[in-house]
Amino acid sequence: MAEEEPKIGVYICHCGENIAGAVNIEEVKKFAETLPNVVVVRDYLFMCSDPGQELIKQDIKEGRVNRVVVAACTPRTHEPIFRKACEDAGLNKYYFEMANIRDQCSWAHWHEKEKATEKAKQIIAAAVAKARLLEPLEDRYVDITQKVLVIGGGIAGIFAALDIANAGYKVYLVERNPSIGGNMAKLDKTFPTNDCSACILTPLMVEVANHPNIELLTYSEVEAVEGTVGNFKVKVRKKQTWVDWDLCTGCGACTDVCPPKARVPDEFNEGLSKRGAIYIQFPQAVPKKAVIDIDACIECGGRKFGTEPRKTKDGKPILAPCEKVCPTGAADRTKPRNPEGELIELDVGAIIVATGYKVMDKTHFKEFAPDSPNVITALQMERLISATGPTEGKLIVPSDIPKYEEWKKKVAKGEEVELEARKPHRIVYVSCVGSRDERFHTYCSKVCCMYMLKQAMLLKEKYPDLDIYIFFIDVRTPGKDFDEYYMRCRQLGIKVIKGKVGGIRRMPDERLWVRGYDAEIGKPVEVIADLVVLATAIEPSDGTIELARKLGINIGAEGFFRERHTKLYPVDTMTEGIFICGCAQGPKDIPDSVAQAKAAASSAMSLIAPGKMKLEPLVSEVDKEKCSGCGICVPLCPYGAITMTKYNESMRAEINPALCKGCGVCAAACPSKAIKLHGFTFEQVLAQVRTLAKRGIVEVL
């Protein structure tokens, strides 16, 4: 059939009113009939429907056409459908070309019907010009590595890893912190059922650690990614812990003796308390191992890592406090350790990104007195009310946390003393701090309304006399049982005010003067509060942009990883074989994060399960007889698919089809025109350009 005279069929889709509402279909049909080699022109309401596809199949089977052009919507979503129709009818599917007259024409010129119709003609003419030169191509098959890398050990990463591992596939779970758990581990309870967060999460963390198909790589980060779908090569940097994890039992003896000078803000408690230079991330940590923060360590007694200890006059070694108390020798500083840690290489077939989120820092909001210790973020409030938090769940104002710590030390010594820290009597919540705000983020952070209501409910139930105000722009409760949850909060006596807070002023006694506006009564409101909680925006986690660069995936305008298609492919990325889920993709609550994680896991398993993968032949190929061996193409390839190899005693470029993604950069740059991009050859593209030039659309040099 390749040697036959092209017999082109043009099939024009109405797409309901999406195309027909702006393009005169009958006029376009008459125009298409005049184009060279066009023998059949048909239109249909929805060409992608079964009856629409049947029109194409029937014409192919009856020998009317041997090339197919469909003028419809985007090839991104519909090209596979029409290729399959051609293949089912016995025609090589690469004898198909698509003309996008919806996205590039009708939608772009909805109110200019004459121009839209004329543009549709030109797009179809260019597609027909290319169709005359199409070549039959064959799909390629490559072996797939049946292993998956999951980046991020929060609730989304945990579920993705478990689903894949339970299906019998090897999973590498990489987490940059010493423990998995993510932000969910910091929460006290979860809405709308008020379940204990740790009670839900901890068993899952333990299951991950004990699963035979999961290799847990905590305190590690992805350093580089090479290869392509089915065969990624990933370099992971395991950071130096300065503690022998093979010996560490997680007893915590070392953390108790770390001197005050080495104490720094505790990241897990969101800076409300301090931790030692040697620390275990949190009580339920998995793995529960100590880590030394080398930047905080003061090298007690001049004890440096990798050196023998100094000795006293009587010959006893002078050890650092953590060394002295460690029962297993895990903190032994004599052992030499590489400060760069260890670099390991992994071969995987698919990658799932579940890197989570961070909360926006309060220091951006000068109008809300961010310098006051009693103005905190909602995530800090989670730690304040948690039994594993800095005050063990006792509600006191953050400015008095040092008093609580002193009281705790005295109690530990057996002293009977009362806690003199101030308890808040009035708490004010401020919603949409940084969200829905053109100065910062225009998007809604989705979970803020519900977690403010949750915290207020928990506090009101535990402390009935507590006076709680919540300033909302709008109350958004669009989930299952969410609105009932909101009504329950109102019934408890929590004061919900529709309106914005204009400013907060710090008072000399560390209380806070809150000035807001009540939109329902149309008057300003003033509240003197002991504690203010800011519902700051959910933001992409630190390192998102750098990780996107390493993976070769896109970032959206809001800073989160961008999905391939919002509705059809919400967990896929534009880089095949790499999936996203959870808050890495955008703000969402725990159920939505879990659902998306399971979807990403399912997509990854569908990819690796066959063991082989079909690749399109739309890749570049070098004609070594024409190649001059200049090597210009090698550094230009963004996928590392081109190498220089020996050919007839000379060096020539060679393209690995398994790595090539068909971007065409090499073909465009080759001065010898020795590189051919199948499906987009020089002749095919030039034919399209010349067709448009004849009609006055473009100029050709």
Curated annotation (Swiss-Prot):
<dbReference type="InterPro" id="IPR017896">
    <property type="entry name" value="4Fe4S_Fe-S-bd"/>
</dbReference>
<feature type="binding site">
    <location>
        <position position="248"/>
    </location>
    <ligand>
        <name>[4Fe-4S] cluster 1</name>
    </ligand>
</feature>
<comment type="function">
    <text>Has oxidoreductase activity. The Hdl and Mvh subunits may together mediate electron transfer from hydrogen to an unidentified electron acceptor on the cytoplasmic side of the membrane.</text>
</comment>
<keyword id="KW-0408">Iron</keyword>
<dbReference type="GO" id="GO:0016491">
    <property type="term" value="F:oxidoreductase activity"/>
</dbReference>
<dbReference type="GO" id="GO:0051539">
    <property type="term" value="F:4 iron, 4 sulfur cluster binding"/>
</dbReference>
<feature type="binding site">
    <location>
        <position position="254"/>
    </location>
    <ligand>
        <name>[4Fe-4S] cluster 1</name>
    </ligand>
</feature>
<dbReference type="InterPro" id="IPR036188">
    <property type="entry name" value="FAD/NAD-bd_sf"/>
</dbReference>
<keyword id="KW-0677">Repeat</keyword>
<feature type="binding site">
    <location>
        <begin position="152"/>
        <end position="175"/>
    </location>
    <ligand>
        <name>FAD</name>
    </ligand>
</feature>
<keyword id="KW-0411">Iron-sulfur</keyword>
<feature type="binding site">
    <location>
        <position position="666"/>
    </location>
    <ligand>
        <name>[4Fe-4S] cluster 3</name>
    </ligand>
</feature>
<keyword id="KW-0560">Oxidoreductase</keyword>
<feature type="binding site">
    <location>
        <position position="670"/>
    </location>
    <ligand>
        <name>[4Fe-4S] cluster 2</name>
    </ligand>
</feature>
<feature type="binding site">
    <location>
        <position position="637"/>
    </location>
    <ligand>
        <name>[4Fe-4S] cluster 3</name>
    </ligand>
</feature>
<comment type="subunit">
    <text>The heterodisulfide reductase is composed of three subunits; HdlA, HdlB and HdlC. It forms a complex with the F420-non-reducing hydrogenase (Mvh), which provides the reducing equivalents to the heterodisulfide reductase.</text>
</comment>
<keyword id="KW-0963">Cytoplasm</keyword>
<keyword id="KW-0004">4Fe-4S</keyword>
<feature type="binding site">
    <location>
        <position position="660"/>
    </location>
    <ligand>
        <name>[4Fe-4S] cluster 3</name>
    </ligand>
</feature>
<feature type="domain" description="4Fe-4S ferredoxin-type 1">
    <location>
        <begin position="239"/>
        <end position="268"/>
    </location>
</feature>
<protein>
    <recommendedName>
        <fullName>Heterodisulfide reductase subunit A-like protein</fullName>
        <ecNumber>1.8.-.-</ecNumber>
    </recommendedName>
</protein>
<comment type="similarity">
    <text>Belongs to the HdrA family.</text>
</comment>
<feature type="binding site">
    <location>
        <position position="633"/>
    </location>
    <ligand>
        <name>[4Fe-4S] cluster 2</name>
    </ligand>
</feature>
<keyword id="KW-0285">Flavoprotein</keyword>
<keyword id="KW-0274">FAD</keyword>
<dbReference type="Pfam" id="PF12838">
    <property type="entry name" value="Fer4_7"/>
</dbReference>
<dbReference type="InterPro" id="IPR017900">
    <property type="entry name" value="4Fe4S_Fe_S_CS"/>
</dbReference>
<feature type="binding site">
    <location>
        <position position="251"/>
    </location>
    <ligand>
        <name>[4Fe-4S] cluster 1</name>
    </ligand>
</feature>
<dbReference type="GO" id="GO:0046872">
    <property type="term" value="F:metal ion binding"/>
</dbReference>
<keyword id="KW-0479">Metal-binding</keyword>
<dbReference type="Pfam" id="PF12831">
    <property type="entry name" value="FAD_oxidored"/>
</dbReference>
<dbReference type="InterPro" id="IPR039650">
    <property type="entry name" value="HdrA-like"/>
</dbReference>
<dbReference type="GO" id="GO:0005737">
    <property type="term" value="C:cytoplasm"/>
</dbReference>
<feature type="binding site">
    <location>
        <position position="630"/>
    </location>
    <ligand>
        <name>[4Fe-4S] cluster 2</name>
    </ligand>
</feature>
<feature type="domain" description="4Fe-4S ferredoxin-type 2">
    <location>
        <begin position="618"/>
        <end position="647"/>
    </location>
</feature>
<feature type="binding site">
    <location>
        <position position="326"/>
    </location>
    <ligand>
        <name>[4Fe-4S] cluster 1</name>
    </ligand>
</feature>
<feature type="binding site">
    <location>
        <position position="663"/>
    </location>
    <ligand>
        <name>[4Fe-4S] cluster 3</name>
    </ligand>
</feature>
<feature type="domain" description="4Fe-4S ferredoxin-type 3">
    <location>
        <begin position="651"/>
        <end position="680"/>
    </location>
</feature>
<feature type="binding site">
    <location>
        <position position="627"/>
    </location>
    <ligand>
        <name>[4Fe-4S] cluster 2</name>
    </ligand>
</feature>
